[in-house]
Amino acid sequence: MHQVVSATTNPAKIQAILRAFEEIFGEGSCHIEAVAVESGVPEQPFGSEETRAGARNRVLNAKALRSDADFWVAIEAGIDDGATFSWVVIENREQRGEARSATLPLPAIILEKVRAGEALGPVMSQYTGIDEIGRKEGAIGVFTAGALTRSSVYHQAVILALSPFHNAIYR
């Protein structure tokens, strides 16, 4: 059984990680331990590079905290060019896999508040009246009318980031 450390305690992210690992490695193939670690970037990262740096830093910090795991996984959400997205970083002892998620354009009224310094999650909670929406369906669930959720979009990115770990051609 794979010991997987999730560098987040966010339920939407943990669900995405668990589903992806089970799809790739089989049901019941992993145990996930969630840890709270720092990203080393602002609460609301801007730009692809800052967001990816946050995910990489979370993996590094999770490895320092739980060095005996088989995999360390981080999902860092950010804002880039008027849209929200995330970077997924997965490492084991030999290699790293990274993938950027799908991108959701944000309405101007939401972007205005985020650019003024508020994090997207609290802004969306104010807009929708849903407490801690970032730990649930997220802006993605709201603006896709539930066709996608934050977790489902992260799930795809985790699957992509796992590609180097089960395809020999990457080694």
UniProtKB/Swiss-Prot annotation:
Q: What is the uppermost EC class here?
A: hydrolase
Question: Which molecular function terms from Gene Ontology are attached?
Answer: ITPase activity; metal ion binding; nucleotide binding; ribonucleoside triphosphate phosphatase activity
| Reactions performed catalytically | XTP + H2O = XDP + phosphate + H(+); ITP + H2O = IDP + phosphate + H(+)
Keyword NADP (UniProt): no
Q: What is its EC number?
A: 3.6.1.73
UniProt lists the family membership as follows: Belongs to the YjjX NTPase family.
State what this protein does: Phosphatase that hydrolyzes non-canonical purine nucleotides such as XTP and ITP to their respective diphosphate derivatives. Probably excludes non-canonical purines from DNA/RNA precursor pool, thus preventing their incorporation into DNA/RNA and avoiding chromosomal lesions.
**Which HAMAP family does this one have?**
Non_canon_purine_NTPase_YjjX (MF_00648)
Query: What's this protein's name?
Result: Inosine/xanthosine triphosphatase
Q: Which organism is it from?
A: Enterobacter sp. (strain 638)
